[in-house]
A protein has these predicted regions:
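Active-site gating/metal-coordination segments in enzymes
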Residues: 99-100, 107-187, 194, 230-232, ...
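An N-terminally biased module of ancient metal coordination in phosphate/nucleic-acid-related enzymes
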Residues: 30-105, 111
Length: 285
């Protein structure tokens, strides 16, 4: 797996106040020095109480969850009690030499806003956090407490992104970033491009490497040609799970993306802890 350390440096996307410091780290890395490794996409939860459509997702034990009636291995089996804690994450990050991370969210885990605020209070120099957009208004005062906003665009009841422009406007106005997992392929790319052009200063990270295993995924990558739009690879090992490590097709897809938007627009994301059911956190780099 290509370790996109240079791309990860672009966590300027989320580390607003540390931009110059991170930029200097990037220049050092270009000259052969030691760089900072940032995980741009992972998850935390204290208690999992999510949903997929109308179906509930509930943690069981040994890393398993009841996924709308289907039992799935949601986490490594050593996560015994269904909790995916910040303490275990930091331990994994320390071992894998990961300096910082962006904690995103997902409907299948339930809204973790309150827990993430606790996590950042414990480790303010290691993590940035997103509040979860759930197709209803989020007060400015609440958004202000977070670094970004997560939109699970592929799971929205109304998948026309133009009908959600208010949250994009708020993010730009409040100087927050958007972390977004888009619907498969090019289903939402035209609307997304309109929003990018409407809010040109808004910083956006497109997750799951543009849903790289679906037709039209390159259209999502092309969005990163815009100045403040980036692509992150959270979930790419899951999307290519049938071929296993070192994921040669995933490597080819990364090279294709480099040709489309340039390596400086790509960020590494692990999708911890779900992808750790097949590989270790360190291997995901």
């Amino acid at each position: 797996m290509i370790q996109l350390e240079m791309s990860a440096i672009h966590v300027s996307l989320s580390y607003n106040k540390s931009y110059n410091k991170i930029k200097n780290k990037a220049e050092k890395l270009k000259k052969g020095g030691h760089g900072m490794v940032i995980d741009a996409h992972l998850h935390l939860w204290d208690k999992q109480y999510g949903r997929v459509g109308e179906n509930k997702v509930v943690a069981l034990k040994d890393g398993k969850s009841d996924f709308g009636g289907e039992i799935r291995q949601m986490m490594p089996p050593y996560m015994l009690d269904g909790r995916n804690t910040v303490e275990m994450l930091i331990s994994n990050m320390n071992y894998a030499r990961v300096s910082g991370c962006v904690v995103t969210q997902e409907y299948i885990d339930g809204n973790q806003d309150h827990y993430l605020l606790e996590c950042r209070k414990k480790y303010p120099k290691r993590i940035k956090i997103c509040c979860l957009y759930e197709e209803k208004e989020i007060k400015d005062e609440w958004i202000e407490q977070f670094d970004g906003i997560k939109i699970c665009a592929g799971r929205l009841k109304d998948q026309n992104l133009l009908h959600h422009k208010e949250i994009f406007e708020k993010a730009e106005r409040l100087k927050k970033f958007i972390s977004i997992d888009m619907a498969d392929g090019d289903a939402q790319t035209d609307a997304m491009e309109q929003l990018i052009e409407t809010y040109p200063e808004l910083r956006i990270a497109i997750g799951h490497f543009g849903m790289v295993t679906t037709d039209g995924w390159e259209k999502q990558i092309e969005l990163a040609k815009h100045e403040h739009v980036y692509i992150e690879s959270g979930g790419i090992t899951w999307l290519f799970h049938k071929e296993f490590y070192p994921y040669p097709q995933a490597v080819r897809a990364i090279r294709t993306a480099i040709d489309i938007c340039g390596i400086d627009k790509l960020m590494w994301g692990s999708d911890y802890p779900r992808t750790m059911t097949a590989i270790t956190y360190d291997m995901s780099k």
